[in-house]
């Protein structure tokens, strides 16, 4: 899991400053970076004082972000954004409810035991079939509206095939392995490809390495911050606690990342 985060997960977010400021040095990256840090700092404060609310915010913004990255349809109006937000939300709820006991341990650690265990387990059993059925209904809706939602109708079949692969993996792997695959590989590669297209770079190895090289300074800073946060607050022998703090670290970086990255889909 750490390897996928290190090689792809963090670097795709580390390019945010270049999305706003450009790959060259004509724009002041320091101002962009300062705004990024201040936004993250405000969210850290929310995690400290209201971890339950911060967790809810994280789930909602992650649903939107995962949905927009996986989405291969049109993005020319709000209706499309609503569809891929709910697809992303269904994915998160399905994944958490499928692995409800593991998720409970992580959420208890994140929220400092503010989670009602019995209620969480009951809701988890409810959300699993609900999220799966909603996802199937959404794809059924998209099937009958392929011309409206996709620039090429065959994209629906590609999107459906991708979802089948992810569903199989979600049902056959532990939560942390699927999370490592989805965030560290699937989501990150798709995100990096969108960034590559944004900067009109080719798909050559040279241009891919160029992107990763650009990401290295801010990747190092992000990893130092996350690791420092982890080692200050949890013992290395506590895997649930470690995973919880990784989630918080990623959550803190997600809000400013979403603010920047959504511009690619406008």
Listing of model-derived features with the role each one plays in the protein:
Residues 25-34, 56, 77-89, 152-160:
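Cytoplasmic-side transmembrane-helix entry/capping segments in multi-pass membrane proteins
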